[in-house]
Amino acid sequence: MSGAAAGEKPVGVRRYSEDMTQPQGALLVGSVNYDDAETTIRTAADLLGTRLRRIPDGEVGKRFHWIMFQPDVIGRAEGIERIGEEPIPFPAGIDARGLRIGEGVDAASIELPPLGYAAAAIESYAVFTRLQAEGAVPAGVRFQVSLPTPLAVISSFFHGDDRAAIEPVYTSAIVRELDRILAAIPHEDLAVQWDVASEMGIIERAAGYGSVMEAWWPGDPFDGLVSRLAVLVDAVPADVEVGVHLCYGDAGEKHFFEPRDAGNLVRYANAVVAASDRPLTWLHLPVPIDHDDEAYFAPLADLAPVGELYLGLVHREDGAEGAARRIAAAAPFAPEFGVATECGIGRAPAGSTEGILRTHAEVAAAW
């Protein structure tokens, strides 16, 4: 399985100097450091315009800290308990305590409440359509909804045997969120991105956030990671765009693992592409700020074709100049790509967001 979906134009790269290629198109990975969806959507459309094929709402509110709000939601379910007597304060009024299945509780009997993703998407889509009707968002641009893989939430907040027990329960809950979104938003307006971070931690056996990140199923962990993500990709209907954002974490702008090259990113992406029944509309791969070396990008030569490839090589610390160095290093191995940050912009310092967006515009051509 390869190639762009029907009617899609592959990402191109245009010459913008004698010795450098210019990427075409930009992707906003998800979170954007603005207070509300309208500001995010307006600003993104204004600064990036036709470089964007889809615009997210910025993951505002409790989603600002990615999945950290999920324990407060899941913890309301009968049969789920919080670990520890006292709340662990976290920004946005979040309680960061972990979760466990109550003693003697059959996990299959647990009924999780709505997780909050569908409600947020439906609310923000109303803003998006209003702005598009006003002409603030170009016609044809889709509304992007980012969802975490179930593995991220399970591996972050559950422990031991509870992980295997709760996995089918939480997976069903996230698929219900997706189905609500699919029922409420016209498919021709929708793009769904799966945020894939903990999976890379398991592949790399990362310990950057404390303990080693490990799988909880029998057999080769890699095979289980591939099959789980392929199921999620295929849960998105063919008339809805689907993307995958691979990530090495972004807690305080720090990774849980520092990759030497893109080899495991390419290996995982290729396996998921091969295992999925439908094509990926886009694939996003992170590029750490320290890597403007060709060795990091060399594995991209073996990447299976996808509709659009975005390299997360834009960093606030070195702007367009640093992005240009990384573009030059990537070009011999990935002749067609657009640009993005390596993770969401949400955790960037306040006041830096506009500059980051402008960097995208400086280094990427419009469609």
Give residue spans per PLM region.
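N-terminal amphipathic/basic-hydrophobic helices that include classical n-h-c signal peptides
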Residues: 1-19
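N-terminal basic, low-complexity leaders that serve as flexible interaction/assembly modules and, when applicable
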Residues: 13-90
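Structural preference for beta-strand elements that scaffold enzyme active sites
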Residues: 21-28, 52-54, 140-146, 189-193, ...
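Well-ordered, non-membrane alpha-helical segments in soluble/globular domains
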Residues: 37-38, 115-131, 166-177, 215-232, ...
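Active-site-proximal, glycine-rich beta->alpha crossover segments in alpha/beta enzymes
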Residues: 92-186, 192-225
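Acidic (Asp/Glu)-rich catalytic clusters
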Residues: 128-140, 182-187, 231-239, 272-278, ...
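Aromatic-lined glycan-binding groove of carbohydrate-active enzymes
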Residues: 226-306
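Catalytic-face loop-and-helix region of soluble metabolic enzyme cores
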Residues: 274-367
